[in-house]
Amino acid sequence: DADIVFTRNQFEAFKKVVKRELPDTMELVEPGSFHGGKAFYDFTPRIIYKKSRMHPDSDKMDYYDGKLNHLWVDLFILDKLPKGKAAAEITRFLHKAIYGLAMGHRHDLDYSKYSLMHKIFVGGLATAGKLIPLKAIFAMQKAIALKDRHSKGDLRYYSNYQPDYLYVTLHKDWCEGVIDAPFEDTTLMIPKGWDPVLKEIYGNYMQLPPEEQRIPTHSSLQIQVYDE
């Protein structure tokens, strides 16, 4: 699995050129574009590889216009957190609440992974969210992400990540500078503070999990890649 992370300014610049730079086999999929702007999956843009297939056809795949049935790379956005721990927590809570509202526009909701309290929270927000146009929910999410763009604070967060990763907090110096790093047969740009970033997200990332947990979570035995 590979992801790309941008600062807000970088992402806005990227969007201006991406359509003309991508080959015909790839496409930028905006999160507000599914089902005529009426279907929610998440708040994450992604680049899909159109000559691939990951799942059999289904109502769920059709609901998302078949766009989620391809290999993709997630595009995450770093935004500024407000100064002060309490203000930062309020920002994260607002994102979680907006995400809950948007869940009312998903194809289906799986409550099995939630505790009773979270089932009530998610179910209530999703029910309320059905009454709000999805376009308005996306506007609220972006407004929250941008509300602290003039903050003097040094902390950043992934504003379009799923709620259980909103805790990830990065220092400005870790992620606003980049270095070139060798990776297999190529060279990639990575955050200057790559080590503290990895530790913030994964903890001791050099230690393997127990053998029974060494199972990929982002893979499928059904992946097909087409030559033509």
Which sequence ranges carry the predicted segments?
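Conserved catalytic core of two-metal-ion nucleotidyltransferases
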Residues: 8, 12, 18-82, 103-112, ...
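"Short basic amphipathic alpha-helical interaction patches in structured regions
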Residues: 17-18, 90
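A short secondary-structure junction signal
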Residues: 85-91
